[in-house]
Amino acid sequence: MARGAGCSTSTRSPRWHGGGCVQDPAPGVAARRGGARGDRRIRSQHAEHGPGLRLLAGRKDHYAADRAEGDRLLEIYPQLADLVQENRAFIIRAVTMAADLGISQFIDLGAGLPASPAVHQAARKVMPEARVAYVDTAPVVLSHARALLATRDGVTAAEADLRDPAAVLGHPHLRAVIDPARPVCIVLGAVLHFMDADAACAVTAGYVSLLAPGSYLIISCASFDDPELAKQLSAEYTPATWHNHPAEVVESFFGGLELAGPGLTEAQTWRPWLAEPVPCHRDGHVLAGVARLGDA
């Protein structure tokens, strides 16, 4: 694969399974994720903090500027709000699966403003002793998180750049609740489409190299069939540049790790809690998957 088209270390063929649309029946799965910081400095590692996507995510803490940009984004692609919400629902299902499999430590990278259910709520529903670290750079994110988490043991917020895995895993706030020598679930939900392919590969490879065997990697990434549509959305969305990664590139972000079934698929068809997908056709997708680091 040519440099810039994906991770050069990945030799596996794409296993993207297309699918239909589902409505997740689980309560409280309205999305908060819209993306994250990419290859230039922005206010937060999670691009939802730009106007527009915060509103499309169904958040209550949006502002007038959010409504204006949200309207413009919807004019370009009316189904964008569906993608944001489907992404969030996938994250909750994937975290639930990891907790079901015995993972008790979670790191949410580019966490964004708190949502309900949050990662710690989803994990603790299955694993009451789960410990969670939220990582971001935006002061508003950190202040919100610390205020909400002040009375919760085993949950913390750390100010760190997700693109520096060693700094993240060594952050004193994170180390107060997370032991990287034990299996950890890393959540990279809707952040890697704000990086070019090489940068995204470097980020995921960095975490994989530092994680204990038996750890999990959760990735979701927006992708559009029409490159021009992606360019229009990127031009309108001010906090970061969107990179339109096709399925084979998104799969390469896993660095050759074996994906849990059903492999790389659309978010709404990854182990849906509603048995029968409702078929639909659209240009935008959230590609999603979960991989496990093999035992030593």
Q: Where do the model's predicted regions map?
A:
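Rossmann-like AdoMet
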Residues: 6, 16-160, 164-177, 208-209, ...
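A short SAM/SAH-binding and catalytic strip from SAM-dependent methyltransferases
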Residues: 162-163, 175-199
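A short, conserved alpha-helix within the catalytic core of class I
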Residues: 167-168, 194-206
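Conserved beta-strand signature within the Rossmann-like core of class I S-adenosyl-L-methionine
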Residues: 185, 211-221
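Short strand-turn motif at the edge of the Rossmann-like AdoMet-binding core
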Residues: 191, 220-223
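Short, glycine-/aromatic-enriched active-site segment of Class I SAM-dependent methyltransferases
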Residues: 224-240
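Short alpha-helix
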Residues: 241-264
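Core SAM-dependent methyltransferase catalytic element
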Residues: 271-296
